[in-house]
Amino acid sequence: FPDARERNLEIEYQRNMERYQFLKWGQQSLDNFRAVPPGRGIVHQVNLEWIASVAREENGMWMPDSLVGTDSHTTMINGLGVLGWGVGGIEAEAVMLGQPIYMLLPEVVGFELTGTLRPGVTATDMTLRIVEMLREHGVVSKFVEFHGSGLASLTLPDRATIANMAPEYGATCGFFPVDETTLEYMRLSGRDPEHVENVKRYLSAQGMFYTPDSETPEFTSNLSLDLGDVEPAMAGPKRPQDRVDLSAMKSHWHESLVAPIGHSGHGVDATQTGQQIEVVGSDGETYKLKHGDIVISAITSCTNTSNPSVMLGAGILARNAVQKGLKVAPWSKPSLAPGSRVVTEYYDAAGLTVFLNQLGFHNVGYGCTTCIGNSGPLEPEIEAAIDEGNLIVGSVISGNRNFEGRVHQKVKANYLASPPLVVAYAIAGTLDIDFEQDPIGTDSEGQPVMLGDIWPTDGEIREVMAEAITPEMFNERYSTVMSEPRWDSIPSEASDLYPWAPESTYVRLPSFFEGIQPEPDPISSIEGAHVLLNLGDSVTTDHISPAGAFPHS
């Protein structure tokens, strides 16, 4: 829907008003506490573009910036040279109240990057290769630090994409040191030039500013990757570390469909792989739905929407596709959910919004959507066809996780890909395609169109990026980020104590503290306790407590 963003924001306020009233009270009543209003972006991307200082001065003392957050992808900020990772809610609350974070000194794995990416290979492709390598190496509870001559070829958003996926490769964080690229991004995103210079002076004095001549630290173990070896790829169908070269996707899909149910198999009987169910869509169009058809195609998640190169690549590909007369497959549900309002600003400046809209990639809101299961419902006719034919249908998203059932309960094959590939697969409408051999569609003249005919060149992307993105754009958007009409109208008054509402079903006075004395009761023995869950490998909290919407039945 063209007005999806506004409609979704209205629904968000209706559903979460009690929470927002509580946060608004906190902003008015507590020192050093800010609440960014809803609809302004994903916290990790807003932090990257605006909040993080990299280093700061307090009471005459300079110190490095640092971060803990209650979402696992808090690690994204390590791309900016800010050490940060995800923690539990109680830990985060303790930090807010002035307590330290306690941790064991971690092992640090060195990851050397050399060379440069080949033309047509994206930051997403690189990140999926790094995820695969680090999962194989084993980095759980460890820090990863990136270094090497290859850093010079990576933009700050490229680094943020890699850092964002630290939970997927299993590390506590994936850290990039501060260098000239970091400072360039700080200037581009509208940070105060004097502050940027002070950051460099402070970190240089501390021996923490990275240059090509910096000595390689001593690590507990080491890996290396020549960026020139990275291939275009996707990851799936059920785990982010299961990378598949794009050139092998068609054969991979055929094997995955009939393989026994597991991390990469769907267990479809070989005699049923040709199953097709006729669907009459809500617009009256008739088509046949089959295994491998892509029913969700989403440019989503701060993992990639924070990176202008892949986002503009998707927009240019959309423009080229529309000019060829291509359309999104009628069974595919496209969506666009940027991580900040700056993305909309540079899409508009580049004249690409209209082409994304023509393909159905309307802006549905600034926040976590399809990657966390908030894709919204499929058309009832499509869901019915999936059930009738026991179809294994797919999604292609630019997110960071693809565990089975996370994106949508009806969608079993979920692949992570760059934003340009999301658009390409939405047009193709199926996983059963070899883009090197098979046309993506036919143009307005009935001639076959190959993906290479519409794929943007690196030069095109750089040219559009240079023209469309300016520091003024960041300054303008973030100058009003703390004000939103609905947020401003929420009734709330500052007070020393929160005025609990007895009728509230959402924000309630906890009963756990009733009867607590200054001296705690003696600790008693736990008897008769049993193991709640005993789980094998690759079982995640998504399997134990799934995200997303509750089914109607």
Model-derived regions: residue spans:
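Long, structured ligand/cofactor-binding scaffold of large enzymes
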Residues: 1-113, 125-128, 232-235, 249, ...
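Mobile "lid/hinge" segments at catalytic clefts and subdomain interfaces of large enzymes
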Residues: 34-39, 45, 52-211, 226, ...
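Short loop/turn segments at secondary-structure transitions that flank enzyme active sites
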Residues: 117, 231-233, 252, 302, ...
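Flexible inter-domain linker/hinge segments
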Residues: 2-61, 189-191, 197-284, 449-533, ...
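Short hydrophobic-aromatic micro-motifs
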Residues: 174, 532-535
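A short, polar/charged loop/turn motif at coil->beta-strand junctions and beta-hairpin connectors
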Residues: 105, 140, 219, 290-293, ...
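Conserved, well-structured core segments
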Residues: 297, 422-425, 531-533
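Short conserved micro-motifs at the rims of enzyme active sites and ligand-binding pockets
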Residues: 122-123, 234-238, 347, 406-409, ...
